[in-house]
Amino acid sequence: MLVCNSCPRGNRPLLTRGPTIPYELTKMLSLLLYPLNQALLLALIALLAMIFHWPRMAFWSLLLGVTWLYLCSTLFFADYLMGTLEDSYTPKAMSVTPDADAIVLLGGAIRGDTHMGSLGDLNQQADRLVHALALYKAGKAPRILVSGGGQPGARSEAEIMYDLLTLMGVPPHAIMQENASRDTYQNAVYTAVMLEKLGINKILLVTSAFHMRRAEALFKAQGLEVIPAPTDYQRLVGPKTMPGWLPAVSDLWQSTYALHEIIGYWVYRYQGKL
């Protein structure tokens, strides 16, 4: 088992040409881009406008906030946003999936340390773990690299995913750990360092379909040959059980995921990371 806790860059240059933003600030700013927080901010502006006797500003701020929150909470809008991310990555049968030198499994499927103890707790993106296991069992690559560092709790995502994969029958020698990354950009950078040392260039990249556009671009920017292996599709296909105009918490959550990815992609483009 190969483990990377700090992943020195070696001779590979950091591909950042634009301005960088500190990680903690990025996470804080991303919260302001969530539809619920935007609606609350507009409601606060409306309240302040009423206090200062600016009725026109109060009216339009409140109307904009309510309209935006409603729109993001509807199935038709959430599906539209997800479609812009997922439709380019249609699922492929295992029989037509190309072979590669390694499967790279990105973190995001672990909630962190919970009452379940050292194995952590899987979240709604657990399909990533299952899909990577299926690719390995199908003989598509001889090893799996799990990438994921900081998360709530004492252990990294990579450590927890390693334990889960070995529990499901993957031999320890076939799993590599990258424990240092804190975001998708670092996933790509640190993984590329590890794979370069092993002479590996062709990978099957496993992540959620809505996350694939950003992830694929970042890994390709590191010089890797990437075969997308998307999973965890969110956009509903076929007949809908509920009218698309009715708001629902699940649709608001889906819109939030999609907007996070769309904005994150363009922020990385602006920073020169893609």
PLM features: what roles do these ranges have?
Residues 238-242, 253-274:
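Extracytoplasmic/luminal low-complexity segments enriched in Pro/Gly and acidic/polar residues
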Residues 50-58:
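Membrane-interface helix-boundary motifs at transmembrane edges
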Residues 9-21:
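Short, Lys/Arg-enriched N-terminal segments with co-localized hydrophobic residues
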Residues 66, 71-249:
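A structural signal for short, hydrophobic/glycine-enriched beta-strand patches
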Residues 4-7:
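Cysteine-centered motifs
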Residues 21-29, 77, 81-85, 259-266:
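Hydrophobic alpha-helical segments of integral membrane proteins
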Residues 21-50:
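Membrane-embedded alpha-helical segments of integral membrane proteins
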